[in-house]
Amino acid sequence: TTSRGKFSAAAGENFPRDVVELRSLLGPLQVGQRVQAVPGTGLEVPLWILGSSLFGARLAAHLGLPYAFASHFAPQALRDALDLYRVEFQPSGQLKEPYAMAGVNVFAAPSDAEAKRLFTSVQQQFAALVRGTPGQLPPPIDDIESYWSPAEKAHACAMLEYSFVGDPETVGQGLRRFVEQTGVDEVMAVSAIHDHGARLASYRLLAESMM
């Protein structure tokens, strides 16, 4: 446990081996197995690979695992990663066919205008990343255009490409189009909304929009 909790420069290189080891620890106890996960052994917990690059896509494909892509903040490689994953997928005991999920940002509110205002929190946060001043999620503002420079806006909007912002109809239509275009099996909705009540309401409206 201690060694697995430490980060080192070799962590990335060792990651594939660590995933295989974890899968074995969650499987049936083998004869001669020196380390046993308690609890864990025999639970067959489904493993996913979450990534934002082609490395994770290839690893998930070669291990026959479901793959989730972090396109809610790193959208550029989404299509290439999904294509690579599907082409190189090798069936496993957990999964017989490719199974993919994509992360998207969802900001749903009763009106498009209200949803766009809620969205300014994460827009400010990503602009702060561009400035090199990351921090906590700020409250929404009325005029995002006065907050960022054209360069900051371009960078933030590029990272937030897969964001669905609006009333339930707008969000629902956008998500259905996204699923149709990418062919993903699941969507992971991320809603970085400053007010907790508004965040819960956004998830409720999202659920209603997909019924």
Provide a role label for each language-model segment.
Residues V179-M211:
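Generic C-terminus detector
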Residues T1-S3, A61, S202:
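Short aromatic-enriched loop/helix-cap "lid" or pocket-rim segments at secondary-structure transitions
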Residues T2-Q36, A77-G183:
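An alpha-helical appendage that flanks or caps ligand/catalytic pockets
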Residues F73, V106-A108, I193:
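Active-site-proximal loop/turn and secondary-structure-junction residues that shape catalytic pockets
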